[in-house]
C-alpha cells in the first residue's frame, strides 16, 4: 500500500539528491553529451532527443518512487476544482506571470543587461520550421517539468526540510538553473520567478493539472509568438 510519509527516510533523500544531481548534469553538460556522440549541439535531432530524455527521466523517477520509495510519484493528494475555478486560476496565473516577467524585463533593460540569447534564437529558428517539435517542446515543458519539479521534488524536499518555503526556493532555483544553457541571466531569473508562482500555487491548491496546463500554454504561446516574429 502506498502512503505519504510524515518524516524523511533514506529512499526519499536519495531520490531528491539524484534529481538535484541530474538537473545539474543536464544543465551544464547536456549539450556536450550530444557533441560527444557526434550530434550538433542545437539541431532538430538533438532537440527531439533531449525532450525524449526528459520523458525517460520522468519514467525512471516514477518507477523509483513506486518501487524503491514505495510511494506515489505525487505525494500530495490531487484536489479537484470546478471548471470555473480552473479558468479563473489560469487567468490569474497568466496575469501574475505576465506582470512579473514584464517587470523583470524592464529591470534588466534599465540595468543595461544583455537580454538576447543566441542559443534561444537558434532554437526558435528550428522550431519555426518544425511545428511538431514546437508542440512537443511545449508539452514536455508543461508535463515533465511540472511533474519532476513541483510533483516529485517539492513535496519530498518539504518533508526533508520541514519547511515549504525552503523546498519551494530550492526547486525554483534548480528550475531557473536548468535554463542556464540559454546563456543569459534573464533566462535564469525569469524561469525562477515562474517557478515560484507555480510552486506556491501547487503548495496552496494541490492541483498539478492546472500548473501543467498553464506551463504548457505559456510556453506554447511564447514559442508561437517568437517563431512568427523571427525572420530567417
Predicted regions and their residues:
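Juxtamembrane helix-loop-helix connectors linking adjacent transmembrane helices
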Residues: 39-45, 72-141, 232
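Function-critical hydrophobic alpha-helical transmembrane segments in multi-pass membrane proteins
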Residues: 120-169, 173-177
Amino acid at each position: 500500500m502506498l502512503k505519504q510519509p510524515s518524516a524523511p527516510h533514506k529512499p526519499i533523500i536519495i531520490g531528491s539528491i539524484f534529481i538535484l544531481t541530474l538537473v545539474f548534469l543536464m544543465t551544464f553538460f547536456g549539450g556536450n553529451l550530444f557533441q560527444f556522440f557526434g550530434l550538433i549541439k542545437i539541431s532538430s535531432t538533438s532537440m527531439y532527443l533531449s525532450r525524449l530524455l526528459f520523458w525517460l527521466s520522468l519514467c525512471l523517477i516514477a518507477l523509483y518512487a513506486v518501487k524503491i520509495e514505495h510511494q506515489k510519484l505525487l505525494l500530495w493528494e490531487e484536489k479537484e476544482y470546478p471548471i470555473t475555478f480552473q479558468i479563473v486560476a489560469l487567468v490569474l496565473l497568466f496575469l501574475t506571470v505576465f506582470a512579473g516577467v514584464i517587470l523583470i524585463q524592464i529591470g534588466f533593460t534599465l540595468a543595461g543587461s544583455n537580454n538576447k540569447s543566441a542559443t534561444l534564437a537558434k532554437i526558435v529558428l528550428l522550431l519555426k520550421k518544425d511545428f511538431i517539435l514546437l508542440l512537443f517542446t511545449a508539452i514536455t515543458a508543461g508535463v515533465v517539468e511540472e511533474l519532476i519539479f513541483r510533483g516529485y521534488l517539492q513535496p519530498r524536499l518539504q518533508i526533508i526540510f520541514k519547511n515549504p518555503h525552503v523546498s519551494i526556493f530550492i526547486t525554483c532555483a534548480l528550475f531557473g538553473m536548468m535554463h542556464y544553457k540559454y546563456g543569459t541571466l534573464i533566462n535564469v531569473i525569469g524561469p525562477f520567478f515562474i517557478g515560484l508562482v507555480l510552486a506556491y500555487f501547487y503548495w496552496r491548491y494541490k492541483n498539478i493539472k492546472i500548473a501543467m496546463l498553464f506551463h504548457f500554454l505559456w510556453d506554447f504561446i511564447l514559442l508561437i509568438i517568437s517563431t512568427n516574429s523571427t525572420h530567417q
